[in-house]
């Protein structure tokens, strides 16, 4: 037990009553995750008696006190593990975060200009992360907000449900690529920045900057733009380094309490893997649906064994191609590993697991347009193996219509008391080109209830206003 978690209770007994003094040396972050609450609601009065003395004037009253110390050892917060998903058979519209509906606000209430939003959850709260350009709307710093990488970008967060304004946002670190996750005790934040030829991964655990990882291919080292995944105190992060139009081999970093303890080098179909969206299929396996920006419209699919710390990559075999741009579904001939055509370019895709006692559901998102970042549709496949199943995925509803932007999407899970709620988030970009501001809203859909997905999402933002 760490010294910081020791609570010392000193009880002073006096002839006139009781004084309780509680010395708490645990940190606030620890107390937030403790299930123990100390309450003192009853009064204690020391007993008194009447003294009959023959000569009362010679009696001297002496106050004596006794001190008794009791030490309470409170348990550490638990490491998190994946649990069964909460019950449900369909996703519904849960939340829209559309900051620029409040674009008339100025000063600290102005919405930040952001892109690449994602959500990560701990036992008690979820955080909405994004990469900001260190600018707000309205404002005078719109130039450059369409760039992917520059010296001003930062990883920021707000509590999920808050609008990412200047005053609401926490700035975690300088970064033009990011990730974050909670191990059950503390947050791990990941940020990447630096020149394209020598970028650097930085790790922050709680409030401390703890470790770094250097570029290994000297070609835009970057991470997944969605939540990393933790089990038993170990957090797994996908990274890649290489050409956007050629070879870019990924790795996984195993991180514990902010320190890199192992590198994992995947085998298999490793030519190009980036922007993976990952989650737990079980307590043994992390699965990721990723982006190949160079060769194929199929998604590279990773299986990482957390018991052996080994990973393998193969292409998804389904005839429902999930990247954008993409060819017609079912048009790629040959074995599952065939790349097909229209493989140049791509987009990060949403992916989340529905873990059930007797089966597993894998939920995916893809744009409705085959060529543009417009619209977003939800798909599901129960059981089977994504490496070998060639069947089409089942469409499960429209989250964003063809009239609205559908850019990056991602998966995450909200912690309920006894189960985990799978969700998919969608980045809806306001693309003002290079002459004005360029930012995003976030739409969130979660597993809840039964029936059909009922309603799509609009941002409600008119950039001309």
UniProtKB/Swiss-Prot annotation:
UniProt catalytic activity: Hydrolysis of alpha-(2->3)-, alpha-(2->6)-, alpha-(2->8)- glycosidic linkages of terminal sialic acid residues in oligosaccharides, glycoproteins, glycolipids, colominic acid and synthetic substrates
E.C. designation(s): 3.2.1.18
InterPro entries tied to this protein: Glyco_hydro_34, Sialidase_Influenza_A/B, Sialidase_sf
Quaternary assembly: Homotetramer.
This protein's name: Neuraminidase
Species for this entry: Influenza B virus (strain B/Memphis/3/1989)
Pfam family, one: Neur
Region feature (Hypervariable stalk region): 38-85
Cofactor (UniProt): Ca(2+)
Virion surface domain ranges by topology: 35-465
Topological domain ranges for the Intravirion compartment: 1-11
